[in-house]
Amino acid sequence: MINEIKSDAQTRMDKCVESTKTQMAKVRTGRAHPSLLDTIQVPYYGSLTPLKQVASVSIGDARTLTVSVFDRTMIAAVEKAIMSSDLGLNPMSAGATIRIPLPALTEERRKDLIKVVRAEAENGRIAIRNVRRDANSNVKELEKEKECTEDDVRRSEDDVQKLTDAHIKLIDEILAAKEKELMEF
């Protein structure tokens, strides 16, 4: 039973790290990256469809993304969806492709983005600590029901703490990489 609690905690902590990675990927750096447009939804035959299902996104150069729309009739809709996103991008269509130049980030904007990234990292750490709390309380419940000993509880808490430390370290590494990426000119 304790092993199930630990494996559940491991799975939930992994999800927290992945969620944090996803949230940080949404923060735009000065460099072009196709994942920047992953959150954009395009109206397609009456329903919202992810951009990557109606077009392919590639890197033109360090500051330009190129979007190749599969259906030429969708070019205007894709362009409008990119413009209306909160990324502050201005797409330019050139035939069947859409070029998206990424403006350079100012020093002030970089600092604001670093604050956002740090907040996301802290949210990830909090989520991991909540998973730790849940796992430890579940183990203590088992002890109250006399399904495990006090030594088992201590051992389990130590194991869960090691998991917590490892996952928080992962988030810190992701944060450091993102901060470094943001501060590059």
UniProtKB/Swiss-Prot annotation:
It is found in: Cytoplasm. It comes from the Bacteria. Signal peptide: none annotated. It holds the Pfam family RRF. One of its GO terms (biological process) is cytoplasmic translational termination. Keywords: Cytoplasm, Protein biosynthesis. InterPro entries: Ribosome_recyc_fac (IPR002661), Ribosome_recyc_fac_dom (IPR023584), RRF_sf (IPR036191). Belongs to the RRF family. This is Ribosome-recycling factor. It comes from Shewanella pealeana (strain ATCC 700345 / ANG-SQ1).
